[in-house]
Amino acid sequence: MRWISRPGWPGHLLALAAGALTPLALAPFDYWPLAILSIALLYLGLRGLPARAALWRGWWYGFGAFGAGTSWIYVSIHDYGAASVPLASFLMLGFTAGVAFFFALPAWLWARCLRRDNAPLGDALAFAALWLALELFRSWFLTGFPWLYAGYSQLQGPLAGLVPVGGVWLSSFVIALSAALLVNLPRLFPHGASLLLALVLLLGPWAAGLYLKGHAWTHSAGEPLKVVAIQGNIAQELKWDPTQVRAQLDLYRDLSLPQQDVDLIVWPETAVPILKDMASGYLGAMGQVAADKKAALITGVPVRERLADGNSRYFNGITVVGEGAGTYLKQKLVPFGEYVPLQDLLRGLIAFFDLPMSDFARGPADQALLKAKGYEIAPYICYEVVYPEFAAALAAQSQVLLTVSNDTWFGTSIGPLQHLQMAQMRALESGRWMIRATNNGVTGLIDPYGRIVKQIPQFQQGILRGEVIPMQGLTPYLQYRVWPLAGLAGVLLLWALLGRRLRPQERRLFG
């Protein structure tokens, strides 16, 4: 098995296969032990490699992970971006090759500056710290691509109890640490004290996760809210067709009018497919309908802001009418779907760079939460719910979470179910109920433990009725966020860096 840790194609191909295991640990497959196996194979494959070979080993791992785990991008480009099979394949491969460097560069850094082959315990801790730093970096760099985090595999796994303590980040850290420790255990057998400490570090977090699973960090803030969520199941090719606007508005109206004994009626992202100011009459009428029911209606709608120079800016928004108030403008935009980077160069080249409603502006950072029935509701539009820290900042101020989305872009791929899993993780992190309304699924109600209580399956038109309980109190993660864990990672990485520079007799103190 030494070939695994040597430069060359056999090791690279194993890294590719190990990376491809990543999505199998996540939704919709949920074989969570594969997350540990995947990372363990990468860690083993990096052992002893020179920096240049480690860079390519990490790149192949990333190519496997993103190639298999974000294959839904091909569906968006080909099926809905009107790109040919060769062009869609080329763009997909180009994207995958680029984001694979998220793993390549840390692998190079690991081999060049941090790896400590003669200190297996310290080496495992430093590797887990670097893995956490990588996931944090991915959530921020170039607006972020926080997809395929290892920690999502634990949504209902043994580590779920740790998620309210340190978020998905803590789960990822423990998985990476466990993977490295399992690889290094045979090397620790001759060293009793180090072996004992390694076993504590290996088993302790999993035991703590099981012990805390189901612990109530938050409590009720009032009576349950009766919720109706509408899933319109509008085909994407009809979504922005001007001749279909009236039919869509009538559909959501007709599905909502019969609803009685309700507090919140929720429609999906851009359920109103025309600008808010153009739909003022319709929204006013629906607001009166909701008020007559003593309810609030919350819907996605594009918003126009007229500027002093005569131009306009457009936003992806959510607005509340009836017994509620507020309009929220989306802050985290989807590249190419809602805005086009370098648009002066790319617009007009292919249809994928000219998708409908792909010229949105970013909403301001300090926006008030939505208000309905006397409660603060944290809004997330589509992609925003996948950002743990962004979501936590809003959740801490709220009693209920709300996410609206249109996952039609991803067809029958695994993308919508991955997206749902990340939304579930936000509920678990915050200890709050979440309402999720989507155009074509999965619409559902999620409890504070990340479990789906009710749902409408994908690709069906439907009406979901249920209750959510407004919650108050802060989980440790909402209170302290990722900073304690990031600080620990920084200390461990500094420890590893210093350990590489010490003389052999001093290095034992760091091992």
Curated annotation (Swiss-Prot):
Lyase as a keyword of this entry, yes or no, is no
Gene Ontology biological process terms in this record: lipoprotein biosynthetic process
The entry's keywords? Acyltransferase, Cell inner membrane, Cell membrane, Membrane, Transferase, Transmembrane, Transmembrane helix
* Topological type in the membrane: Multi-pass membrane protein
Instruction: Show the coiled coil region(s).
Output: none
Kindly list the GO CC terms recorded for this protein: plasma membrane
How would you classify this enzyme at the top EC level?
A: transferase
EC number from the UniProt entry: 2.3.1.269
User: Does Disulfide bond appear among the keywords?
Assistant: no
Listed pathway(s): Protein modification; lipoprotein biosynthesis (N-acyl transfer)
Q: What does this protein do?
A: Catalyzes the phospholipid dependent N-acylation of the N-terminal cysteine of apolipoprotein, the last step in lipoprotein maturation.
Say which family it is in.
Belongs to the CN hydrolase family. Apolipoprotein N-acyltransferase subfamily.
What is the recorded name of this protein?
Answer: Apolipoprotein N-acyltransferase
> Organism, per UniProt?
Pseudomonas paraeruginosa (strain DSM 24068 / PA7) (Pseudomonas aeruginosa (strain PA7))
